[in-house]
Design a protein with these regions (language model features):
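A short, N-terminal "cap"/entry segment at the start of jelly-roll beta-barrel domains
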Residues: 1-7
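N-terminal regulatory/effector-sensing and dimerization cores
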Residues: 8-103
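Amphipathic, well-ordered alpha-helical segments in soluble domains
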Residues: 32-35, 89, 118, 122-125, ...
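Hydrophobic/aromatic-rich alpha-helical bundle segments in the mid-to-C-terminal region
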Residues: 49, 132-139, 160-165
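Aromatic/histidine-rich interaction motifs
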Residues: 98-124
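All-alpha amphipathic helical-bundle segments outside canonical DNA-binding/catalytic cores
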Residues: 108-117, 132-147
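A short, Lys/Arg-enriched amphipathic alpha-helix from helix-turn-helix/homeodomain DNA-binding modules
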Residues: 115-128, 143-146, 162-188, 193-196, ...
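Basic/polar phosphate-binding segments, predominantly the helix-turn-helix DNA-binding elements
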Residues: 152-159, 186, 190-222, 242-270
Length: 270
C-alpha cells in the first residue's frame, strides 16, 4: 500500500511505516482527527511537544507548523487513520445542523480525545475503507464519515464547537516572536505570512520595519549564523544540521555557508 494512502479523496488517509520516519516541516492547513492504530506519533511545535500511542485520538488545530516523528513499536509497525476536517465540509455541517458560534477559539491547539464506545465504533467502521482501498468511494460517503466524526466529537466534548466551527482568520500575532521561534521551518514566505495573520504585502512591510531586512535575506542570515554556532561551539556535523535549519539540501547549505563565511561547513568544523 502506498504511504500515505488517500482512502477517500481529500478526507480519509491511512499511513503505514515499518521504520522510523521524521518529517521536519509539516504545515497543518486543516483541522484533523487522528487515530493511532499502532506505533507512536510525536508532534513538536514551537510551544509544545506531545505523543500518543495505540488507541489514542488527537484533534489537531488548523494553521500550525510542526515536526512529526512516526515510530513503529514492537512488530506492529506504525499505523494511523486521519480524518481531514476541511473548512468547506465543516461549514456545510454547521448549516445542516444549525450550529452557530460567535466566539473566537482561544483554547489549546491540540487536544487528546478521551475514548468512548461511540468513537471506538466509528473508527472500527472506517477500517473496511482502509482494507479495501482499491475500491472507489464517492465524495458523498466521505462527507457522511466526516459528519459522523464531527457529531461524535461534539457528543463527547460539547465545548469543541468553538474549536471546529471558528472560521475566522488568524489574529495578527507578534511577528518578531513568531519568526525567531520558527525560522528553521522550510516553508514559503506566503505561509509565514498566513500564520502570522497577515497578507503577503502586510507581512513584508511589517517584517522590514522589525528586522530592517527582507524576509528571505533574514531567513538566510539567521539560519547560517545558527549553523556556524552549532558547528563552531557544539561541533555538529553539517549533515546533521542542515535539514533542521531549513535548508533543502546539503549542497545548497554548503554553497550558501561558503558564500557568507568564506569556507565550507566541513572546513569550518576542522
Amino acid at each position: 500500500m502506498i504511504n500515505p494512502s488517500e482512502i477517500i479523496p481529500g478526507v480519509l488517509f491511512y499511513s503505514y511505516y515499518s521504520s522510523l520516519r521524521k518529517e521536519k516541516v509539516a504545515f497543518l492547513e486543516h483541522n484533523m482527527l487522528v487515530l493511532q492504530v499502532s506505533g507512536r506519533f510525536t508532534m513538536e511545535t514551537a510551544s509544545e511537544k506531545f505523543s500518543m500511542e495505540r488507541g489514542e485520538m488527537l484533534l489537531i488545530r488548523r494553521n500550525q507548523l510542526g515536526e512529526l516523528t512516526k515510530t513503529p513499536l514492537n512488530d506492529e509497525g506504525y499505523q494511523t487513520i486521519v480524518i481531514c476536517l476541511k473548512e468547506d465540509l465543516l461549514r456545510q455541517i454547521a448549516l445542516e445542523e444549525q450550529i452557530e458560534t460567535e466566539k473566537k477559539y482561544t483554547g489549546p491547539n491540540n487536544i487528546i480525545i478521551p475514548g468512548n464506545d461511540f468513537l471506538d465504533a466509528f473508527f472500527k467502521s472506517v477500517i473496511p475503507y482502509v482494507r479495501h482501498s482499491e475500491q472507489n468511494v464517492t465524495n458523498s460517503v466521505g462527507m457522511l464519515k466526516v459528519k459522523e466524526a464531527v457529531l461524535l466529537l461534539l457528543h463527547t466534548l460539547p465545548d469543541l464547537k468553538d474549536f471546529l466551527f471558528d472560521f475566522s482568520e488568524p489574529y495578527k500575532i507578534d511577528l518578531e516572536k513568531f519568526m525567531l521561534s520558527n525560522y528553521h521551518f522550510n516553508i514559503p514566505i506566503e505561509k509565514f505570512a498566513r500564520l502570522t495573520g497577515r497578507s503577503l504585502a502586510g507581512f513584508k512591510r511589517d517584517f522590514q520595519k522589525i528586522f530592517n531586512m527582507a524576509p528571505r535575506a533574514w531567513l538566510q542570515e539567521i539560519r547560517l549564523t545558527e549553523a556556524r554556532h552549532l558547528i563552531e561551539k557544539k561541533h555538529k556535523k553539517p549533515s546533521a544540521i542542515y535539514l533542521d535549519l531549513g535548508f533543502e539540501s546539503l549542497s545548497h547549505f554548503s554553497h550558501s555557508f561558503k558564500k557568507k563565511f568564506g569556507k565550507t561547513p566541513s572546513q569550518w568544523l576542522v
